Amino acid sequence: MDYLDLGPYSSASGTVRLPGSKSISNRVLLLAALAEGETTITNLLDSDDTRVMLDALGTLGVKLARDGDTCVVTGTRGAFTAKTADLFLGNAGTAVRPLTAALAVNGGDYRVHGVPRMHERPIGDLVDGLRQIGAQIDYELNEGYPPLRIKPANISVDAPIRVRGDVSSQFLTALLMTLPLVKAKDGKIVVEVDGELISKPYIDITIRLMERFGVTVERDGWQRFVVPAGVRYRSPGRIMVEGDASSASYFLAAGALGGGPLRVEGVGRASIQGDVGFANALMQMGANVTMGDDWIDVRGIGHDHGKLEPIDMDFNLIPDAAMTIAVAALFANGTSTLRNIASWRVKETDRIAAMATELRKVGAIIEEGPDYLVVTPPEKLTPNAAIDTYDDHRMAMCFSLVSLGGVPVRINDPKCVGKTFPDYFDRFAALAKA
């Protein structure tokens, strides 16, 4: 098996410019493809997840011109020209869910599938929502999961669409992005969320980006959304993808654990991503954090004892960045509790189980619940732990931080970071020092 040995490191400092946000990149690509006009996207993330979206859009007849991190997309004015396609979407939830919705109203015959793990990630709530407006979608293997067959359908809206919000916010995102393409009698479509909506900041990203493309969604709290029907997205001309706030979390934690000063460029106060909230969680743990509009500085830990304070927090709003807190908790002077993280179980892997298993390898005492994780750090980290990564980019990036505890650590299958951050380990090595 491929592996990478890191550390031991005693400090981390320097400046890192973040790659583009995965969540924003794939949303903007789809919106630009559906819009009227030509859109120039800058700072587009180059990763496995964006490549599968680009490949799919190309297969569907969208004209794309890429040059480095810039992509010029010629919009299709709301309808893909290819009426049959077989689309392989890897393990990219940000591609599978929104594309499924867009294809369901496109009047074609499509197959949507991915890697084996994608076929274990739920999509039933989205399909149920789309069937309410007449979409013809069949499951090829297991009810509620990809692969999917999508067929031409008579789409009509005559009542509010109901969708569950407690498994993944991507189901609601997919509906919101697609419904402007659908006609309705009174010119608007209502979406009602059943249960508590998780990961609300990701819905905020969706609504803000739709607005950049000329479509305004009204919302009543987080339970009711009103979407204009039968309208056209319009290209904003140019749009820049801000840095990936989830990816920022590893470097911000490194700046705390490794003393800093460490500056992350590309996200800050002006970010539309909820995961910048990670900086506040890190501050609660005692890190010295300063934030500008598009940068964040971290300069070590503000306690004389040099350890982070333990944290007990609800991480429903920032589930991806919360993984970094679980590893940072190894460096706290007490027990930390991460609550309301049930969504971890349906991500790239079952992240609660994976995180519990790997934290134990470095000596932590772990209590794992259906939607929580309790981390008690060891007196001393176990050196030379071989960390399994479960084909999950975030597991690999999180556990790189163990090397800042003065012990070497082995990361198995390090190339899995290609999903969102192909050169992560090069960037990390440039900042970490023995």
UniProtKB/Swiss-Prot annotation:
Keywords: Amino-acid biosynthesis, Aromatic amino acid biosynthesis, Cytoplasm, Transferase. The keyword Transferase applies. Pathway: Metabolic intermediate biosynthesis; chorismate biosynthesis; chorismate from D-erythrose 4-phosphate and phosphoenolpyruvate: step 6/7. It is found in: Cytoplasm. PROSITE patterns: EPSP_SYNTHASE_1, EPSP_SYNTHASE_2. GO terms for cellular component: cytoplasm. CDD domains: EPSP_synthase. It holds the Pfam family EPSP_synthase. Belongs to the EPSP synthase family. Catalyzes the transfer of the enolpyruvyl moiety of phosphoenolpyruvate (PEP) to the 5-hydroxyl of shikimate-3-phosphate (S3P) to produce enolpyruvyl shikimate-3-phosphate and inorganic phosphate. Monomer. HAMAP family: EPSP_synth. This is 3-phosphoshikimate 1-carboxyvinyltransferase. It comes from Burkholderia lata (strain ATCC 17760 / DSM 23089 / LMG 22485 / NCIMB 9086 / R18194 / 383).
